[in-house]
Structures are given as C-alpha cells and as structure tokens.
Amino acid sequence: MGVTELGKLIGKEARREIKLESLAGKCVALDAYNALYQFLASIRQPDGTPLMDRAGRITSHLSGLFYRTINLLEAGVKPVYVFDGKPPEFKLLEIEQRKKAKEKALEEVEKAIREGRREDVAKYAKRAIFLTSEMVEDAKKLLTYMGIPWVQAPSEGEAQAAHMAKRGHCWAVGSQDYDSLLFGSPRLVRNLAVSPKRKVGEEVVELSPELIELDAVLKSLKLKGREQLIDLAILLGTDYNPEGVPGVGPQKALKLIWEFGSLEKLLQTVLKGVQFPVDPLKIREFFLNPPVTDQYSTELSTPDERKIVELLVEEHDFSQERVAKALERLAKARGKVKTTSLDAFF
C-alpha cells in the first residue's frame, strides 16, 4: 500500500533517525509484501535482472528475506512478518491498473534487452516486479524453517500489523509505507527491510531506520485525532482512491481539514458534487475498522537448518558455503534476541 502524498507532509519534527540496535528486545510487525517487493527491487544482478536459480525462478526475495532477517536478529530485533489476505473490493480496480502497468513495463524490459540498453533494462525491471503465489509460499516456508513467526492477515497486512501494535504485542510496524499510521499503529519504523547502504548517483549513502510516531504526526500537523489524518489522506489519495481529489495538494488538503474539520462537512460544502470512484466515507470506515485476527503468535521457534538448506541450496541453488555461514549467524543471533528481550523486560 502507499499514501506517498501524506508522507510529504510529515516533517522532521515527527520523524527521526534511529540506530537499528535501539530496537533491541522489541517486537516489530513487518509488512511482508512491502519487504518482499523491496528485496525484489533492490537485489539484482549487474544487468538489472533479479537473482534466479538454474530453473529460471526468481530468488531475490528469498535472499533478502534470509539475510536481512538474520541482520535484524543480530541487532536484537524480534521480527514478525504479516502477509496480506483478501483486499477490499474497492481496491480491485487499482490492483488491475497496477497489473497492466507492470505488464507494459515487462514489454519495455524485453525490448531493452533485445536492443542492448542495459540502463533501461534496470529501470523498467524495477517497475515490472511481480510477486507470485509461489514466491509468497516459499517466503512463508523459509520463515517457518528459520523459526520466525508470520501472520496471515484476513485483509490488508498493514491493518493487521497495526492491530498487533495497538494491542501492545508489537512495539511498532515496519514498512516503507505510511498506511499503518492510518490504521492506528502508534509507531512506524521505515528502512528496516532495505539495505543500510544505497547508491544515489555515484555516491553510496547510509540509510538509517526512521521512527515516526502517530502522536507526533498528529501534533505536528495540528490534527485533533486519527480520523482527521485519515480524512487528510483520502483527500490526497490512498490505495483505494489513488487520484485523491483533483487539484488538491498536500498544503491545500491540510488547510481544508483545519477549516472544515471533517470529510462529512467537506462533502456537504466545497466537495459537493465531486464524483468519487469509491465512497470516501466507506474508505474511512475501512481504515477505522479493517478486518483483523487475534489468532497469531509473536514467539520465535527452533530453526530447522536441514529444511533451510533443502529450500535454499538444493531447490534454489544458493551457495552452500554462504548459507552455512549464515546459519551460524542465525544460531548466535537467536541467543542475542532472547538475552535482549530479558534485558528489556527487567
């Protein structure tokens, strides 16, 4: 999911860089699809294509999930991955439009490969990322074998993750998107599932985790509550109404919320007669009361190293030596998570 325009309004006073180690002993509910897409976009071969096994199956997501999760454990973080379930009906049109855009990007990739345009291959390949059901199932298998808890959300993953954070079972939600704040998560941590180093032009820059707290966002934007934040996001555009209200940018949307106070009053006045593809009040209700489940665990379990080797090395052609070294790190890191959890408790 993504409410990128809302992110433009969240200033420095509501977000701060933190060290990964500051999350030691804390449970973070990670938006699994968001993380997997990050891995697919960033873990690539020199020609811009994703990592693949000998059968031509993409493995970038498994590589990212395996090694990044170990990094989190080594920092003392307790990750729980939350997977999307069935999207709300009013999101289906947007999903279909995204699919068409990806298919078009895939055509551009194939054309660029034929014409030898390597830079364009990399550019369009990132736009053509697909996450198949088989890839998701492999990711779930890997997490199970690693002893990492994962949760199947009935609907939106970020809604479920926010629910877990609101209940105090997780300290924060981990995602690049801001939707979990709309779903009520008290905290959002960004940049957890991305490489700590990123190339910008010719420079390599450090990318630190970023903490955003819901209360700080509401205070900085002078909003009276989460309902107004949701209304603001709807004006700017969400996954359920990507275009938002035509002609209404971030600053104008904020002023409208300050002046009129609610979406209802706006619909009765300045937005009267504006046609919405989806009822905005229906969208707001979904953010306030999404389908969630209480059937989940945040506890780590014992890894099955043999199963990890079977999945990564034997089935997907990962380097046996690299995986063996990573398994040693995994064993040590799990002990660190247990220790830091006890330290945080006492």
Swiss-Prot record:
Family the UniProt entry places it in: Belongs to the XPG/RAD2 endonuclease family. FEN1 subfamily.
GO molecular function: 5'-3' exonuclease activity; 5'-flap endonuclease activity; DNA binding; magnesium ion binding
SUPFAM superfamilies: 5' to 3' exonuclease, C-terminal subdomain (SSF47807), PIN domain-like (SSF88723)
Subunit structure: Interacts with PCNA. PCNA stimulates the nuclease activity without altering cleavage specificity.
Transmembrane segments: none
Lineage: Archaea, Thermoproteota, Thermoprotei, Thermoproteales, Thermoproteaceae
Name this polypeptide is given: Flap endonuclease 1
EC number: 3.1.-.-
Cofactor(s) this protein cannot do without: Mg(2+)
Binding residues annotated for Mg(2+) 1, in chain numbering: 31, 84, 156, 158
Keywords: DNA damage, DNA repair, DNA replication, Endonuclease, Exonuclease, Hydrolase, Magnesium, Metal-binding, Nuclease
